[in-house]
Amino acid sequence: MAAATTSRRGPGAMDDENLTFETSPGVEVISSFDQMGIRDDLLRGIYAYGFEKPSAIQQRAVLPIISGRDVIAQAQSGTGKTSMISLSVCQIVDTAVREVQALILSPTRELAAQTERVMLAIGDFINIQVHACIGGKSIGEDIRKLEHGVHVVSGTPGRVCDMIKRRTLRTRAIKLLILDEADEMLGRGFKDQIYDVYRYLPPELQVCLISATLPHEILEMTSKFMTDPVRILVKRDELTLEGIKQFFVAVEKEEWKFDTLCDLYDTLTITQAVIFCNTKRKVDWLTERMRSNNFTVSAMHGDMPQKERDAIMGEFRSGATRVLITTDVWARGLDVQQVSLVINYDLPNNRELYIHRIGRSGRFGRKGVAINFVKKEDIRILRDIEQYYSTQIDEMPMNVADLI
């Protein structure tokens, strides 16, 4: 068992001291970026980006990754895992060689694009070339960028596989494969695409998996393509985010959820909020109904054109829009710091999605409130979530506005 963590301070600082990591024997805790053996021009980029001290997961995972080890790193949203990936990749890549050397796969276009942005920012002084290879964007642009030469591809499995099969994305120089949100990638529909990509990669390959939740069956699967991985794990019981107050509102019927939501709008002053529905159709229906009742909301789901999704994300990220209604496409790892309230209009279809949704409301230690709308038949799901995460979800108090 590794020692308790040292907290990171700086923009979006998180108090890490309550996180306890279960790590492989011999994993060092490196308390400063300067001690990691990172090149000077990369350090400049890290500090320019606003980091002062590594987060708990960064303190443990960066050194094994840049040393060439296979790594399974479990870290919840908001612990700095995207910047950990970016930092490690920037250190490993030889920028003098204009070939793809690292491939990062993510379950959503938005997460892949965010990884590209963070890596370009951190790697600014080393002139790293990164391309987000994602569906919904022009194949012609992918072909142009890849033929011009990039060091890193951050992409979604479908588009990356397509580019490899077209022989536009050449894999001969790839030495590092990173699967971000590995539970989503391997456990829920992406497994075949991952294996398709993996078959085209060189045999001497370093593989890293990073995710907020790593169920037992996912860990078993890693034995197929990882060699003696270093494990850096958060105890499951501690995956509930500190500082997030979780409540439920009992609603007798589905129709009552809408009235409850309107009541909350009247009583809460919200900086920014995300409302989750389980289906795209429900997102469209709720958005239309809210707007017809003179509430200003934006909406996003996977059927929308990529350009429209980018515009909506940009507006929400900048604070131009305050309330976003969405499906779980938004729930995994997207970095919008101002979100103070998450409403689960529908409880998620599985308990592991719950933490990805709730993680939105308290990133890097920001306090947050999560409110779950619960019908009678949902009580069992709610209790299952409570038990799984060893947490307590209380009935929403009258003074909930004071907690946001």
From Swiss-Prot:
Keywords: ATP-binding, Cytoplasm, Helicase, Hydrolase, mRNA processing, mRNA splicing, mRNA transport, Nonsense-mediated mRNA decay, Nucleotide-binding, Nucleus, RNA-binding, Translation regulation, Transport. GO terms for biological process: mRNA splicing, via spliceosome; mRNA transport; nuclear-transcribed mRNA catabolic process, nonsense-mediated decay; regulation of translation. SMART domains: DEXDc (SM00487), HELICc (SM00490). GO terms for cellular component: catalytic step 2 spliceosome; cytoplasm; nucleolus. It is found in: Nucleus; Cytoplasm. Residues 243-404 form the Helicase C-terminal domain. Residues 62-232 form the Helicase ATP-binding domain. Expressed in roots, leaves, flowers and seeds. A motif (Q motif) lies at residues 31-59. A motif (DEAD box) lies at residues 180-183. InterPro entries: DEAD/DEAH_box_helicase_dom, Helicase_ATP-bd, Helicase_C-like, P-loop_NTPase, RNA-helicase_DEAD-box_CS, RNA_helicase_DEAD_Q_motif. The keyword ATP-binding applies. ATP binds at residues 75-82. It comes from the Eukaryota. One of its GO terms (molecular function) is mRNA binding. The Q motif is unique to and characteristic of the DEAD box family of RNA helicases and controls ATP binding and hydrolysis. ATP-dependent RNA helicase. Core component of the splicing-dependent multiprotein exon junction complex (EJC) deposited at splice junctions on mRNAs. The EJC is a dynamic structure consisting of core proteins and several peripheral nuclear and cytoplasmic associated factors that join the complex only transiently either during EJC assembly or during subsequent mRNA metabolism. Interacts with MAGO1 and Y14B. This is Eukaryotic initiation factor 4A-III homolog A. It comes from Oryza sativa subsp. japonica.
